[in-house]
Swiss-Prot record:
Cofactor names: Mn(2+)
Family the entry assigns: Belongs to the peptidase M17 family.
Record text on cofactor binding: Binds 2 manganese ions per subunit.
Record InterPro entries: Leucine_aapep/pepB (IPR011356), M17_PepB-like_N (IPR047620), Pept_M17_PepB (IPR008330), Peptidase_M17_C (IPR000819)
Location(s) in or outside the cell: Cytoplasm
Molecular-function annotations in GO: manganese ion binding; metalloaminopeptidase activity
Organism: Pectobacterium atrosepticum (strain SCRI 1043 / ATCC BAA-672) (Erwinia carotovora subsp. atroseptica)
UniProt protein name: Peptidase B
Positions of the catalytic residues: 213, 287
Catalysed transformations (reactions): Release of an N-terminal amino acid, Xaa, from a peptide or arylamide. Xaa is preferably Glu or Asp but may be other amino acids, including Leu, Met, His, Cys and Gln
The keyword DNA damage is annotated on this UniProt entry: no
UniProt function note: Probably plays an important role in intracellular peptide degradation.
Length: 436
């Protein structure tokens, strides 16, 4: 411990009255004390208090701290870091002593979840479709290189191989669209069955296309690749925890731009599974690129297909930035994810998805419209329903996550502005605890 570090301790005792009613922070000559407001240093309420207190400490410009005294287990240490970390500037934490397993887990989270947050926070100028794909490869090779093989398909090769949705959305940008197909196979057996396929939306900037977003909706669209980053992090964390099952990762990466070559309203996309889609809103592009990844995933016949995307504003209207929205026809898979989310203390909430939602996308010229008709306003549910048309066995083993808790446009009491990394640990846990 150095002399210029601030000590941070935990207490179940209330703060002295001079610090204010229900104060969560007090100061003495040794440093800060976080008063968790409960009789235990463990539990959901204590974790939230620690995270909020860490945000306040960072807000005071304190960039070097030492976690001192009792109570700094893995969960509390991680809660502190989630609140303390910000998108700019360096912060140094001297951690309390942990056992070897918890120390490894903490270090893996610091590496992988912080990679997710940093990647989502990158400006679009620095992160195009191909850069996103190569960053994902670099992370997974760093974690488990011997188990990783991958293929990157881009530009005209996508068109020639009939990746119609991804090519159509990405063709309007000078930066070529890219599909990353990564095979994590720790068994070493090329004939091993695929346990799960992960399909991520990787729109590295979304103008909305000709259905142009206003500035207030476009200013955070560097984060529209949050689903791809989250799934990459989840697979990396699961691998670091010892995942022994084969998993394939598909990242559908593109810019959605306006240009003379960009796709237009009224265009019809013809997919490899025989479905045709009429484009009536170019700002509903995420589902168009995911469709290609879901077709590939279905061809692998995995037990599970999990897609993750910053897909709709409707999910954010329902849940804010506080929960990821969860959709599935498979109640058992939903229950498994919710149990994993509870164990990792991460927020997921199930929203409706019923068979009738699949009929809410009529088109006069194609099998499907890429947006629901005006009479059907359940935007998040109909977006999920659209995706179901590209999953062969959509009623079983398929999970769609509309990841509305990925990014915050402004700071709140628990989070700095920017990416949160929420969902990475839950999905890693799900892959591990339910792989047979």
């Amino acid at each position: 411990m150095t002399n210029n570090t601030m000590l941070i301790s935990l207490s179940t005792q209330p703060a002295d009255a001079r610090w204010g009613e229900k104060a969560t922070l007090s100061v003495n000559e040794q440093g800060f004390t976080i008063h968790v407001g409960t009789t235990s240093l463990n539990g959901k309420a204590a974790l939230a208090t620690i995270q909020r207190a860490a945000r306040k400490i960072d807000g005071q410009g304190i960039k070097h701290v030492t976690l001192a005294g009792e109570g700094w287990d893995l969960a509390n240490s991680w809660a502190f870091w989630q609140g303390y970390r910000g998108p700019k500037g360096q912060r140094t934490v001297e951690w309390a002593e942990l056992n070897d397993a918890d120390k490894k887990e903490l270090n893996d989270r610091l590496k992988i979840v912080d990679w997710v947050r940093d990647t989502i926070n990158l400006p679009a100028e620095d992160l195009g479709p191909e850069q996103l794909a190569t960053r994902a490869v670099d992370l997974l090779c760093d974690v488990a290189c011997d188990a990783v093989n991958y293929r990157i398909t881009k530009g005209e090769d996508l068109r020639e191989q009939n990746y119609a949705g991804l090519y159509t959305v990405g063709r309007g940008s000078e930066r070529q669209p890219v599909l990353l197909a990564l095979d994590y196979n720790p068994t070493g057996n090329p004939d091993a069955p695929v346990f799960a396929c992960l399909v991520g939306k990787g729109i590295t900037f979304d103008t909305g296309g000709y259905s142009l977003k206003p500035s207030g909706s476009m200013d955070s669209m560097k984060s529209d690749m949050g689903g791809a980053a989250t799934l990459t992090g989840a697979l990396a964390l699961a691998a670091s925890r010892g995942l022994q099952q084969r998993v394939k990762l598909y990242l559908c990466c593109a810019d959605n731009m306006v240009s003379g070559n960009a796709f237009r309203l009224g265009d019809i996309i013809r997919y490899r599974n025989g479905k045709t889609v009429e484009v009536m809103n170019t700002d509903a592009e995420g589902r168009l690129v995911l469709a290609d990844g879901l077709i590939d995933a279905s061809e692998q016949n995995p037990q599970w297909i999990i897609d993750c995307a910053t897909l709709t504003g409707a999910a954010k209207m329902a849940l804010g930035n506080d929960y990821h929205a969860l959709f599935s026809f498979d109640d058992e898979l939903v229950a498994a994810l919710q149990e994993s989310a509870k164990e990792e203390n991460e927020p997921f909430w199930r929203l409706p998805l019923e068979e009738f939602h699949r009929s809410h996308l009529p088109s006069s010229f194609a099998d499907l419209n890429n947006i629901a008709s005006g009479a059907h306003t359940a935007g998040a549910s109909t977006a999920a329903a659209f995706l179901s048309h590209f999953v062969k066995n959509y009623q079983q083993g398929w999970l769609h996550i509309d990841c509305s808790a990925t990014y915050r446009k402004g700071a709140v009491d628990q989070w700095a502005t920017g990416a949160t990394g929420l969902g990475v640990r839950t999905l890693a846990n799900l892959l591990l605890s339910n792989a047979k």
